[in-house]
Amino acid sequence: MNFDVVIIGGGLAGLTCGIALQTQGKQCVIINNGQAAIDFSSGSLDLLGQLPSGRQIQHFEQNYTALYQQAAQHPYALVGKDKVIEKARQFEQLAQTLNLGLVGTCDKNHFRVTPLGGLRPTWLSPNSVPIVTNEEMFPHRKIAVLGIEGYHDFQPQLLAENLVQHAQFAHCEVTTGYLNIPELDHLRHQSREFRSVNIAQLLEHKLAFSDLVREIREAVNGASAVFLPACFGLETQEFFSALKQATQLELFELPTLPPSLLGMRQHKQLTQHFKQLGGLMMNGDKVIAADVHHQRVTQVYTQLHQEIPIQAKDVVLASGSFFSKGLVAEFEKIREPIFALDLVENDRFNLQDRMTWTHSRFSAPQPYQQTGVVIDEHCRARKSGQFFENLYAIGNIVGGFNGIELGCGSGVAIVTALVAAEQIGGEK
């Protein structure tokens, strides 16, 4: 099997890179094993939420120098400010083209409401999610937060109590309630199955829609805005939009405990577009080995096609971090399992000293979360001190940052994906 580009990993980074390359006329295959982190995400995409010093930021461009000074190994520091902004804006255009329904701009962060009633800075959010800026008040004075009876992954009272602590919601009257939805009685008797995905599947196929509309309208107690758990609409936002139109209320949905319908919808849309452009998905398979000759990967072998190598001019590693097994931690070492690539170290994290991998305080940023593959400004991966000519690393497999701490995981995935795609597309 021969392709222009083999992409290892089908998450946000892999799909974004694949779409960009297919648009340039490259023939790509994505080798994907299992679910990606995007399936468990909030649906909002972060560019940079705070600096390593802990200071929350609003404007990326104004704070880039501080990021560079505090985290010189960060992928943004390697790529450069202008390139990061260019690629962020490129993705904003792509999101519009694909009708992803995202709002926001890389010029300034906004705040999304979290399931616990907090406010988290972010770059792009689904248009169905409640958002505010630092300066504005939420436009609705009366808010109803409605859960679903027996569904424990969304707590209306806790959300309501925390929400009014923020200046943007201090003027709001927030009430809480629960929807019964009799069609869900079967799931209520099986608590393990009472999750957002199962609820959405059941509602789309067996729901008396008019009864749900009536129940919501009766539960809001005169509120003009309604916050609901993201359990309405499995693969698209069409069901939720229809519900909003039928109730004639400003309905908003909030992400629940994983898996997240908001992230799964995005994954579905990106995958469909990649396929529509002519890309091939090899699902349920994984790369286990590769042939390398003079700093070039010539072919890769997968678990299901060990006797049939897959050849490509370029290879993109988008296999994720520990969660997706793109990185593997053993008792005495952390390694990248396919190519044995060099991993990022610093004065606080030593691959040879396990005691430096973690912080004694559980809630503190953990040093091991910053490790990952060493790349250059073009996202080429390094092994034994030398950079490959045609192997690129993108997304959470890349080292030098803690996406949870800094609020930049999605941004790094998107920016590195588009930088690698540009580099590959420009090759002769």
Swiss-Prot record:
Species of the source: Pasteurella multocida (strain Pm70)
EC number(s) reported in the record: 1.1.5.3
Domain of life from the UniProt record: Bacteria
Cofactor requirement: FMN
Pfam families: FAD_binding_2
NCBIfam families tied to this protein: glycerol3P_GlpB (TIGR03378), PRK05329.1-1 (NF003718), PRK05329.1-2 (NF003719), PRK05329.1-3 (NF003720), PRK05329.1-4 (NF003721)
A biological process term (GO) from this entry: glycerol catabolic process
Family: Belongs to the anaerobic G-3-P dehydrogenase subunit B family.
GO molecular function, one term: glycerol-3-phosphate dehydrogenase (quinone) activity
InterPro entries, per database record: FAD-dep_OxRdtase_2_FAD-bd, FAD-oxidoreductase_2, FAD/NAD-bd_sf, G3P_DH_GlpB_su
Function noted in UniProt: Conversion of glycerol 3-phosphate to dihydroxyacetone. Uses fumarate or nitrate as electron acceptor.
Keywords: Flavoprotein, FMN, Oxidoreductase
GO annotation, cellular component aspect: glycerol-3-phosphate dehydrogenase (FAD) complex
Protein name per UniProt: Anaerobic glycerol-3-phosphate dehydrogenase subunit B
Subunit architecture: Composed of a catalytic GlpA/B dimer and of membrane bound GlpC.
Biological or metabolic pathway of the protein: Polyol metabolism; glycerol degradation via glycerol kinase pathway; glycerone phosphate from sn-glycerol 3-phosphate (anaerobic route): step 1/1
Keyword Cytoplasm recorded: no
Reactions mediated catalytically: a quinone + sn-glycerol 3-phosphate = dihydroxyacetone phosphate + a quinol
